[in-house]
Regions:
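Flexible "arm" and connector segments at domain edges
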Residues: 1-56, 60-104
Length: 104
């Protein structure tokens, strides 16, 4: 994750784009790019893998930049969230079903 953060810092500093990367703008960009990612599946599942990868990279890029901007350890919060989700969906109750946790 540190390599990604550093690469984005350098890229943005070279272009003087940090001024535009407010938390609000980065959050908006995540939503916009997530919409573009969803478009890959709009009418069927016959997606172009290269295009899908580009859109997924855009979403992840903005997530990394937002986390860096607001000084959040992205790896830590994702792993913490996974632990919480494991508790909500214990294997013995959730395996093989898609029922929401409050209805297990």
């Amino acid at each position: 994750m540190d390599r990604l953060k550093q690469a984005f810092r350098e890229f943005n500093e070279e272009r003087d784009w940090d001024q535009f990367h407010t938390p609000e703008n980065l959050a908006k960009s995540i939503c916009i790019e997530a919409g573009e990612l969803l478009e890959c599946f709009q009418w069927d599942n016959n997606y172009d893998k290269e295009h899908l990868c580009e859109e997924l990279a855009d979403v992840i890029s903005y997530c990394v930049m937002l986390a860096d901007r607001i000084d959040i350890d992205l790896e830590e919060i994702v792993l913490d969230k996974l632990e919480k989700t494991k508790k909500k969906y214990p294997v013995e109750k959730a395996k093989g079903i898609s029922t929401k946790y409050d209805q297990l």
